[in-house]
Each structure stands twice: as C-alpha cells, then as structure tokens.
C-alpha cells in the first residue's frame, strides 16, 4: 500500500523537464513543463552575492570558496535553506576568491577530465594557502549541483528537483571516465536519475527545435554542420552529417583545455604590454 502511495506522490511531483549545464566557469538551469505547451524558461538561482546579501541570478558561477577558521562570520555563508554552511558557492565565492585565490576552487569540471590527477582526491584549490581546506573535483561538482537542487527545491517545494526529468550536459569530448564522474557527482547531490546530453548537441537542438518542420529547407544545400562550443574552460567541436535519413553525428573534437578563461588572460596580457605595467592576474 505504501509503495503505491509513494509512487502516486512521485508521479504528481514530476512536472518539469529540467536541463542543467554544469559549466567550467558558470552553471545554469532551464525548465519546460511536461504537461502543457510552453516555452523553455531560464531558472534563476538563489545565492549569496556578498557577506550581507542574498540574491537570485540567472547563472551560478562555478566557484567554491573555503574560508579560514576565523576569516568571516558564519552568517556570511548562510542561505535561506541552510544556516550552517561553512563554505560559499556562486557569486560570493567568485568575488571572495579574487581576494584570496588560495581558498577558492575553480574549473573543477576540467579536473574531471584530467587523467594525470585523481578526481576523487582532495587536491583543490591547486595552489591552496598553507593549512587551507581542500576538496576533490567530484566534491566541488557535487556542491554546485546540490546548490542548484536546493535553490530549485526552495522555489518549488511541491516539485523537488530529484523527482523531475533531468538532463545534464557534458562536453562531447568527455571520455567515459569523465562522464561517469559527472554522474557520480550528480548521484552524491541526490540527483540519481539524470540523462547526459553532449553540449554541442544541446546547442544544436536549441536551434533545431523552432525549425523542426522546416529544417531541411533552412539547411538546403548544406551537407555538414560544424558546431563550435567555446565555453569558459574548454572548446568543444561536433560535426553533423545531413543525409536522406536525417541528421547524424559523425565526429567529435579532442578535449581542448582552452576557453573564455584563456581569452581573458590573453586580453589582460595585451593590456599589460600596451600599458607597460604588470597586472595582478
């Protein structure tokens, strides 16, 4: 009897398809109702933006700040759903990490694909301050996903994120190990039933959906499509073949640790050269 009741509750709680982009520098969520015609919506994510302010932002910066024992009051990390946090995730973590880089974890996603490091070993921040706390790449990813779960659940108490149809994007160039580690991070965050979708394909589907009835006309004369996904920490390339049977993925580029972060540094170096000063990068 209890099993039937629990199943009924689960069915009534499942209302959305939720897409999660666990990014190298920024993470995001979008949702679409299952039972009605509607447009895709971006999901704002509640997060701390300073010691004294919590706000809703369109993305969650993928930064984890691990403060020292007496660095700041505990209330500086409180969130509406948890008043006992001893770390910060998101905008405040990014801002605080710029002040003390040795206490902030960034680019955890890249470490999931790093074969010369153990993703389950607590090695981040890579250049941590002396006696500073460290976490693994999997744990950092778990905290980002858990934060997005908690923010969603706070806004949708009757429709918990874990009970929705979940799609989690990964780079097309992620190997099976990196994909399994992403699934493990989601499992640890309480998101056990997720479908992985390659990021360039997700971008292409976004273009394709409003043209689903006319795409052959839109792509008349085109034989192949190259999707270039330049992210915060990686570049991802996917080639799609157009033939009589439809669309077929035919190639994926190598995993390139090159992205917006590198572009920022290149611009900063150019500014240094032109200004004739050394910047604190």
Residue ranges, per PLM feature:
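Phosphate/ATP-binding catalytic cores across multiple sugar-kinase/actin-like superfamilies
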Residues: 3-4, 13, 143-159, 206-216
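Gly/Thr-rich phosphate-binding beta-strand-loop-beta motif of the actin/hexokinase/Hsp70
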Residues: 6-40, 212-249
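Secondary-structure transition/capping motifs at alpha-helix termini
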Residues: 36-37, 155-158, 188-195, 214-216, ...
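Phosphate-binding loop and its immediate beta->loop->alpha context
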Residues: 41-188, 265-281
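Active-site nucleophile and cofactor-binding loops and adjacent substrate-binding regions
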Residues: 52-55, 195-201, 258
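Alpha-helix capping and helix-loop boundary segments enriched in small/acidic/polar residues
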Residues: 173, 177, 225-226, 254-262
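Short acidic loop-to-helix transition motifs that present clustered carboxylates
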Residues: 175, 198-205
């Amino acid at each position: 009897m209890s099993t039937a009741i629990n199943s009924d509750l689960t069915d009534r709680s499942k209302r959305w398809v939720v897409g999660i982009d666990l990014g190298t520098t920024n993470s995001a969520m979008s949702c679409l109702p299952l039972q009605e015609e509607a447009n895709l919506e971006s999901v704002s994510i509640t997060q701390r933006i300073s010691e004294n302010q919590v706000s809703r932002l369109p993305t969650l910066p993928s930064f984890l700040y691990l403060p020292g024992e007496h660095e700041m009051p505990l209330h500086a990390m409180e969130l509406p759903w948890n008043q006992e946090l001893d770390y910060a995730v998101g905008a405040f973590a990014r801002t605080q990490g710029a002040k003390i880089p040795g206490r902030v974890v960034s680019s955890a996603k890249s470490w999931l694909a790093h074969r010369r490091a153990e993703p389950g070993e607590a090695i981040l921040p890579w250049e941590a301050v002396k006696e500073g706390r460290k976490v693994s790449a999997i744990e950092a990813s778990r905290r980002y996903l858990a934060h997005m779960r908690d923010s969603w659940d706070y806004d949708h108490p009757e429709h918990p994120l874990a009970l929705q149809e979940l799609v989690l994007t990964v780079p097309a160039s992620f190997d099976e190990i990196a994909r399994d580690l992403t699934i493990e991070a989601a499992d640890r965050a309480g998101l056990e039933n997720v479908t992985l979708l390659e990021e360039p394909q997700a971008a292409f589907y976004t273009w394709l959906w409003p043209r689903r009835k006319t795409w052959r006309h839109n792509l008349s004369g085109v034989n192949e499509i190259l999707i270039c996904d330049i992210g915060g920490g990686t570049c991802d390339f996917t080639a799609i073949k157009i033939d009589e049977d439809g669309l077929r993925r035919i190639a994926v580029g190598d995993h390139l640790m090159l992205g917006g972060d590198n572009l920022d540094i290149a611009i900063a170096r150019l500014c240094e050269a032109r200004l004739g000063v050394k910047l604190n990068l």
